[in-house]
């Protein structure tokens, strides 16, 4: 089965076009000023047209208010919203009602008890993004290049639709797929030469590793 792959934090046409050419199913644009991958909505909207119809356009936000979401949705016309902050189930439901878009809810995982965070969102979030908890002192909820113990997902209900995230790169993605059986994965820092700088060679290697895992 072909793995769904989201390349997140895209900021240039070159990186976006390479991701799509390599077979990315989702392209992620991050709207969070503290992130080195932050992009202005109008810039993201122009970039997204290079991928529209070939990969899903995902807007990634962190505890954004309605004014910010209005601006992002108007400029980008995303097909999916990824909520990567502390949005509670009621907020997720309100956002879905407001925009009529499917929602990926990101949840931080470090230990088995963190999987209990999923249950309140069942039937509300359309999919989960299971990411490693940020290291102490980090201002970023994701894109930190750290992984969690993938064996924790052995306890996950098989019906939970999720994307695996957190420190995935060409050197570990085969193991991650083999251990978890994940059908969808996400990376950002794993295909960068520096924070926010996508590296086409690393992107090539990442997809090569995924195809080996699928063989």
Curated annotation (Swiss-Prot):
Q: What is its EC number?
A: 5.3.1.24
Tell me one GO biological process term. Answer: L-tryptophan biosynthetic process
Indicate the enzyme's highest-level EC class.
Answer: isomerase
The record's keywords, sorted A to Z, are: Amino-acid biosynthesis, Aromatic amino acid biosynthesis, Isomerase, Tryptophan biosynthesis
Q: In which pathway does it act?
A: Amino-acid biosynthesis; L-tryptophan biosynthesis; L-tryptophan from chorismate: step 3/5
**Reactions performed catalytically:** N-(5-phospho-beta-D-ribosyl)anthranilate = 1-(2-carboxyphenylamino)-1-deoxy-D-ribulose 5-phosphate
Gene Ontology MF term list: phosphoribosylanthranilate isomerase activity
InterPro entries with a match to the protein in the record: Aldolase_TIM (IPR013785), PRAI_dom (IPR001240), RibuloseP-bd_barrel (IPR011060), TrpF_fam (IPR044643)
Q: What NCBIfam families has UniProt attached to this entry?
A: PRK01222.1-1
Q: Which family does this protein fall into?
A: Belongs to the TrpF family.
Q: What is this protein called?
A: N-(5'-phosphoribosyl)anthranilate isomerase
Q: Which organism is it from?
A: Sinorhizobium medicae (strain WSM419)
Q: Which gene encodes it?
A: trpF
